[in-house]
Amino acid sequence: MIKVHWFRDTPEERNDWLRFGLMELSKKKEINYAEWDLKKMTNYGFSNKILSYGSLRHLSFLVVEDGERKIKCIIDNEDSFAFLSELIVHADVYFCAGYNSNVFQQKSLPKFYIWQNQEDVAWYTDLLSKKIPDFENQFYKVKRFIPIGPNLWKHLPISKTRQLCLNIEHRLRKSLGLSNQYRIVHEVFRSRYKDLLKLRNQQLSFDITLSDTSWGWPNHRIKLHQQLKKLSQKGFKINSELKLTEPSVCDNSISLNLNPENFSMKIGEIKNYEQMLASSKIGVFTCGFHWGWRNIFTLALFIGIPVITDRLLTEPYFDINNFKIWETEDEDWRLLQNCLQEITIIDWNNIKSENQKAFDKYLAPEVVARYVVNESLK
């Protein structure tokens, strides 16, 4: 049986979707899955240089073995292709959530948005101009992955007696050199997944629900929220908020001098974001910071509602055209009103059904886990 070892370093929430999938495959006896403390990675072939590297943020380290080979895998769930980790040299396979074919196949800069000027992307251009020549000989290891999955955490109460038993079991397993137990985490993930499935049954109540921040080319986001205000004034049911965040050198927002008194930009009220999003005719999302997907975007795909987004620069391992979404580069977001007027309740339900089928085919946790296992062993 194929064995998968995950060497844990907290926090790794961005890769919980894969983690849940591996737990499910193990429960079905498709694989043997184990979790270990990070320092155990050297017993399975990883370099001890990783342990002294510093920040391992958004990186996970796995070994997949089939009885003959031990394949060292890094799962990179950073927002962008620009943040390829130099630790790739210590991996056999490198799964990259921020995959972009221009970067990793053509070894060139990505095709930026038409509304982005040279100053908007200068920081990334400079970074990539160094990383591509430095690591292009490692690009053969890079494989497409998925962006951040929906949040899988929730609070599940545990009795004092059970917690005591778990603590004893944990100490015993440590003393015997056994892998870490993850039973409680698996229960949390399963419970949360059931909650997510219920969101698919929400009825249409709103036109657009969007909770947003200025992080990531704020002028573009401001234009979106200005358009949402116009739509609200025309009678569309809009609930949205744009909060101001600290400016960044990455997207040149540090030079904009945005007035805090103009924020937050708010329309209506958002009480339960996930439920209201699931009840909205359209999910609309600007590109994430560093062009990455946000987990709320992936949640919208899971729920199945129609989605309008900036053209996607990050490429998952499946064809995004399997989903009914609209990609745009219109900085004035004029597409919104057209879609709101054209999509009927029948269309909405049909699109949801098709998108849910696509999600379950390409993005269900077990499917993602099988993809990682199979691609690792190719």
Give names to the regions the model predicted.
Residues 1, 377-378:
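Short, Lys/Arg-enriched, disordered terminal segments
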Residues 2-63, 67-291, 310-320, 365:
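Nucleotide-sugar donor-binding catalytic core of glycosyltransferases
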Residues 259-262, 270-377:
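Catalytic binding pocket for nucleotide-activated donors in carbohydrate/polymer assembly enzymes
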